[in-house]
From Swiss-Prot:
Family to which the UniProt record says this protein belongs: Belongs to the CoaE family.
Record-annotated DPCK domain positions: 10-207
EC assignment: 2.7.1.24
Positions contributing to ATP binding: 18-23
Family matches, as CDD domains: DPCK (cd02022)
Chain ranges passing through the membrane: none
Pathway(s) annotated for this protein in UniProt: Cofactor biosynthesis; coenzyme A biosynthesis; CoA from (R)-pantothenate: step 5/5
Gene: coaE
Protein name: Dephospho-CoA kinase
Pfam family, one: CoaE
Compartment list: Cytoplasm
Catalysed transformations (reactions): 3'-dephospho-CoA + ATP = ADP + CoA + H(+)
Lineage of source species: Bacteria, Pseudomonadati, Pseudomonadota, Gammaproteobacteria, Pseudomonadales
Amino acid sequence: MATAAFTPWILGLTGGIGSGKSAAAERFVELGVHLVDADQAARWVVEPGRPALASIVERFGPGVLQADGQLDRAALRQLIFADPAQRKWLEQLLHPLIGQEIFSYLAKAQSPYAIYVSPLLIESGQYHKTQRVLVIDAPQELQIARTLARDNTSAEQVQAILQAQLAREERLRHADDVLVNDGDLAALHEQIDRLHHFYLTLKGGQP
């Protein structure tokens, strides 16, 4: 008799800018969990030669390309943050393509559960394709301070990004688990280790 194919359950991991999603994701990887980041998938679908990049250039012009033909993400970001209609168009183009890349990749995972990391997990509706949602949460002033320390950006740009993202309360409403990341890295790792051991006991993301 053939053995049934192994299929991991999928944990959606999300949080606002500067909440600590990347640090949390790194710890899960250290623990052996198969993970894909929406930002990685977003880069895959706009590589030179892919249809999505051609559509973006047709919409916004050649100014969104670097000299080597790669997408100039900073130039595109400036165009869409000031224009909600353009941002919506871009999201409608990319989200289905990114979802296809992500869930094809996650289906091949060999860990008991796999993680999909996305800042837009709720807004895009992709959380419907996960079995459980983990929200990384942090006070807004800490989100701003972390982002300013990490990125070459202004406080005004960070505020604009925060305002464009889903309201914190709405994100938390969709959470099965909440990790408050308001301490140091060791405290974050301790919380993740506990969650990981809990997740290993779940079947299909449920107790």
